[in-house]
Regions:
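Short Gly/Pro-enriched turn/cap motifs at secondary-structure boundaries
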Residues: 6, 16-17, 133, 138-140, ...
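C-terminal regulatory/interaction regions
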Residues: 251-308
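Metallo-beta-lactamase
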Residues: 40-42, 156-163, 167-239, 243-249
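Conserved beta-strand hairpin/beta-sheet module of binuclear metal-dependent hydrolase folds
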Residues: 4-54, 171-184
Length: 308
């Protein structure tokens, strides 16, 4: 089966979207360069080809900055490190600990292969990425709140802790051009339908606090880790994200309060998510729907969270 061609997208003069729309990575250019997001195993070859087509020397790329450690955001990392050993992995302190876990690596490999199989079936890649003898995710630069990744020519990214989607989540803001690498901190947004699937997998309260925090940063565009770059209406985007979260949470509480079967609610929500995206299997969506139902149930009574 032939593979689909994936071209890079110029967002600004020094910021490019790589990978695929479903699994983007971003390339920031100063005197040095940095990749933001670790992609998937399946997007590794795509990212390498796009960088080559842009005429960027790999030696210029200093860092791969990870927003968080979910499998669909780190999959290209071991392949890139094997190809370009000089790259330094930059991630938050919580992520640095999680990436040392053998259990995490086992779960990553299973999920990454599933994503690759889905992409083959969609014609986005022609073959599975190569199996590696060792999958190494060791973090070279541990990032804390307020740290700056300086690339030169005025391009510098400031680190912000934005947990809630995951405990290890960070976002990065570049003030010269006003670009905010949001990651998954605001959930899964489908621009074609203007619909949000809230993603408070770790904590509803932390998730809402992170959206509120991001809304205060000096940016005009937001680079999401799936599907889109939001440009020119970032304030409205954050408002939509928080309102969608409130609506989802209150729906869960209302339905549970009426005595509906939690399994039935989760199944219905998984079908809804599956109608929005096919980036994961239905089983994964069902598991996440059950997780979010539990999060809403455990964090009832926190309705004052939903303001910006």
């Amino acid at each position: 089966m032939s593979k689909k061609r994936h071209e890079s997208i110029s967002i600004t003069r020094s910021f490019y979207q790589l990978g695929t729309p479903s699994f983007p990575a971003y390339l920031s250019l100063g005197d040095n360069a940095m990749l933001i997001e670790g992609g998937t195993g399946a997007t590794f070859a795509i990212i390498v080809e796009q960088i080559k087509e842009l005429g960027i020397e790999p030696e210029r790329i200093k860092y791969i900055a990870l927003t968080h450690t979910h499998p669909d955001h780190i999959g290209a990392v071991p392949h890139l490190k094997r190809l370009w050993p000089h790259l330094k992995i930059a991630a938050g302190s919580v992520a640095a600990k999680l990436l040392k876990s053998q259990r995490m690596i086992k779960e990553f490999r299973e999920t990454d292969r599933t994503i690759s199989e889905i992409m083959i079936n969609k014609g986005e890649i022609a073959e599975l990425p190569p199996e590696l003898e060792n999958y190494i995710f060791e973090v070279d630069k541990v990032l804390e709140e307020g740290d700056r990744l300086e690339l030169g020519s005025g391009i510098a990214w400031t680190v912000y802790h934005t947990p809630g989607h995951s405990p290890c989540h960070i976002s990065l803001c570049e003030e010269k051009e006003g670009t905010l690498a949001i990651g998954d901190a605001t959930g899964f947004y489908v621009p074609e339908k203007d619909v949000f699937w809230p993603n408070y997998f770790d904590s509803l309260e932390a998730y809402c606090n992170s959206i509120r925090k991001l809304s205060t940063l000096p940016a005009q565009r937001g680079a999401l880790s799936h599907n889109a770059v939001v440009d020119g209406w970032l304030e409205g985007y954050f408002q939509k994200a928080i309102k969608a979260t409130e609506s989802y949470h209150l729906e869960m509480l209302e339905r549970l309060g009426k005595g509906e079967d939690p399994e039935k609610i989760a199944l219905e929500k998984a079908k809804w998510v599956n109608s929005l995206t096919d980036i994961q299997t239905f089983e994964v969506m069902y598991s996440l729907a059950k997780l979010m139902l539990a999060r809403s149930q455990s964090e009832a009574g926190k309705e004052k969270l939903f303001t910006i």
